[in-house]
Amino acid sequence: AAERLTPAEREPAVQQYVLLVTGLRALVGRDREPALILDSYLLRSLAVAGWSPSFGDCAQCGAPGPHRAFSVVAGGMVCSSCRPPAAAAPSAATITLLGALLAGDWEAAEAIGQRERREASGLIAAFLQWHLERTLRSLPLVDRSETTDRILAEDQEPDAWMGR
């Protein structure tokens, strides 16, 4: 799937590379919740590839937001006139989180609750898979549970995870 986010085969994708390295460093540093890092990376990678979702103005007609509907097909938030029947209606906090993740506003992103984080992750996954034109079989396997986050936050050794 990563190859679909780069411009052409065998052509360097410096921005994608820098974004990946930055994301991996953030994961290693454990300063942020891993699920937020992943979602931010996915949104930014899509933006670098030219598929940046709109979280403010209508993605279809450009009408100023905020708007209440999110359409994967349209490219983000849509006004009531452009809203297709299958559009999602995320909470205002979820929309704020999506914008914060795209912009790298970690303070705003970390202030949003778990329910909205799960909702945002689902929208990001749908948006990513739409633009890649394929299902990412590994994406549902990413463990976003609070237990994993707690273990990482406590910086326990692998032996502690095994109960040794």
Locate each region found by the language model.
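Non-catalytic alpha-helical scaffolds and adjoining flexible linkers that form interface surfaces
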Residues: 1-164
